[in-house]
Amino acid sequence: ALPIFIETGIPFWKYIDECFLQRTYTQTQLLGRTLLASMRVMDGKCIVATITRRMMEFYEAKTEDIEGIIDQLRITQGVEVAILLHEIGDQEYKVSLRSNNYIDVSKIASFFGGGGHVKAAGFTMRGSAHDVVNNITGHIESQMFNK
């Protein structure tokens, strides 16, 4: 199929960029800030990042500007699970989970009242960011040791 696009002069790279790669300046700023503030835990098997309401206000970001950040965390070398907390209220977080190989994040999300599938899931949780992460990593550890 690719040679046909090339022969017909269709600018397929332009469409790939526009559909999958381009982001707004706000999205780029929010991504950069989130990646810089991320941390690895569990001997580097898990990466965690938080997007606060203050960050969202500072960058004048909308909820849709967060899209794709969890995937950038997930592709970090050596990481099995990525956790992204998005603060939506006082001590309330929308949690996104992504897995690379053997951790079933849908089981974790289901335990906390959310849903998804094996490699991508989410839920909402109340508590401090630290407490939320501690609750989640306990479930990740139990799957790691029982694989």
Q: Which stretches of residues belong to each language-model region?
A:
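Hydrophobic helix-and-loop "lid/oligomerization" segment in the mid-to-C-terminal part
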Residues: 1-111, 116-147
